[in-house]
Structures are given as structure tokens and as C-alpha cells.
Amino acid sequence: MRLSVTKEDASGMQKILAFFRGEVVLTAALVLALLSFLLMPPSAAAFASVDVSTLCMLFALMAVVAGLRSCGLFDWLAAGVKARVRTCRGLGFLLMSLCFFFSMVITNDVALLTFVPFTLLLLADAGAFALMWTVVLETIAANLGSMMTPIGNPQNLYLYMSRGLALGDFVQTLLPYALVSYILLALGTLLLPAQRRETAQESAPALARDRLVLYLVLLAVCLLSVLKVLPAWVAAVVVALAVALRQPDLLGKVDWALLATFLCFFVFVGNVKAAPVVSQTLEQLLTGRETLVAVVCSQVISNVPATLLLAPFTQNVTGLLLGVNLGGLGTLVASLASLISFKLYGRSQGAQRGRYLLLFTVANFGLLALLLLLVWVLG
């Protein structure tokens, strides 16, 4: 019997391959999950390691943030910045600050997706260095600002939801590093030129106020879940129903690939943990070196996968929490949010990718070294 492949089949296969090429982290997670079944045969235990609460909370937050963006909230805020600040240095400071503080609520990825495109338009005529340096500062600010809250980035959410961290302990662990980071970033804006810039008066973008109220209420529901007042699944169901009824197209804007990546890593870690030799090796490697190992691991595989890989093999959750957050500094892949900025900048007119990457790397490793020195000083 002869098998024939139609054009539709070939086109479908090309789309699937293109999807996996575009989702490198998901592809790697899927391969690792499948390979891990060579260590341990498929069983219910592998899927018992899946943290459903984390997946529910991630989904709810991504849907709510997509809703807030669709209301024009972030465009409205950005327009307000443009209207009130007249110098390049002042704009750099405010844009960096917006990324730093907004990332605590809307995540580092979304903060960069929101403010970097605006930066590229606003500072297009400010000179190559001013534009690159502002985007670098925004990227670092989003990565480090997001560490201050359990919902700021996926690794925080996972550790907070799965390891029973108290909110007070969480904040106490990271607050000194966030404060020092913000001060250093503020000083970094002094490298920007201080000349005044003339900007045309523009009307502020309209806000969809009815939907804005809805998504702010849903954000409050998510925060109640983070504070452990409501179960995560309740928040996910409430958000899913509200979005499906009010704005169903937003469900397509949820990062389903990120959720699938988490699922694959949960399965991988469950199988690895069940293999005595591997689990004992990882436990010995981590003991007493949680922060440093997490930083180094993040440089290679990014901090979210590093968290999922290392978390089951240590009881020192605060050390790991600190390591995977500081580990977002360093290489371009240390935090996948950094790739967002790089791609956005790389598409801009006159982009100097090599120079940007050099500036990014020097700034990241310089700040990482200073913060690791602070870790040593604080003991």
C-alpha cells in the first residue's frame, strides 16, 4: 500500500516544526520529560509531581494581565510619562522605574513587552547609546523588580505556592537586594544625556473603563489566592469564566507554551527525583551552595527551568529563591525576559545588536558580581 503526503499534511508538519523551533525552552522541556522515562517507567508517580496550584495561578495571572493590556491601561500610563518628562535622563529613570515596580504585579515579561516598544519610539532620536542603555536598564529593572513579589515571575510563584513560604520571609529574603538594585539602576541612568527634548502634545489614549474595573477585580481575586485566602483553582475558574464571557479572545493570548513547559518540567523532575542516584547527586551538589548553584545553573538553562530542576532537592528554599532571582542577571538566556528586550530592540531601525549584547553582558555581570558580594556580606 502506497502512502501519499498531501500539501496540507506537509504544511501542517511545517507549522508544527516552526512552533517547536520558536519555543526552544518548551521543546527542551518536552525532550527532557520524554527522556526521563528511560530512568523511570511511566507511572502515576511521575504525574503526581505536577503542581496544579502553580499552573492554575500562572494561567489566572496571565489572563488578567492580558485583560489589563487590552484595556489600554499601560498605554495610558506610558503616554502620561511622555507628557510630563522632558529630558532623556528623566525618561530613562522613569521608564526604568516603571519596569521595576510594574514587574512586581504584571511580571517581568509583560513589563518589558509593555514598556520597551514605547521606549524604542520615544528615544529613537536620542542616540544609539541612550536607546541601548535605557533598554538594558529596563531589562535589568524588570528582572530584579519582579523578585520582590510572589507573582513577579514564574520561579517566585512556584516556590511560594509549592514550598509554603510565608510572605514575610519571602519579602525579608529579597528586600535588601531589591533596594540595592534599584539604587544602582537609578545611578545607572546618570549615564544618559541630560539635554531637553521637545515632544508634540498628544491626547492620552482612551481607557476601556468597564473592562478595566472587571480585570482589577479579577486581579484582586488572584492576589487573594496568592495570600492563600482562596485556593488557586478557585481563582483560575473565576478568571476563566469571567474572561470567556466578557472577552473570550483573550484566552488565546495566554502563554500556553509556558504552562506546557512547566508541565513537562514537573514530569521530568518527578522522574529524576524517583531515581536514587540522580537525586542523591543533586542533593549533595546543592547542600550549602544553593544560591551559587542556582546562579550558575540559571546562566545555562535560564532561571525558571533551574528552579523547577533544583527545588525538589533542597530544604533551603530561601537560598534557592535568592539564587534563581539573582541568576536572572548574567547571560542573555539567564532570564528569558531578557530575550524579549533583545528581540524587540533587534527589530528597531538602526539596531546595533553586537554592541547591545556587549553593553547588556557587561552591565549584567557587573551588577551580578556586586549583588553576590552583598550575599557574602549579609552571610
Where in the sequence are the language-model features?
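Interfacial loop-to-helix junctions that mark the boundaries of transmembrane helices
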Residues: 16-22, 44-54, 165-177, 204-209, ...
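Membrane-core helix-loop-helix motifs of multi-pass transport proteins
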Residues: 127-194, 199-204, 342-371
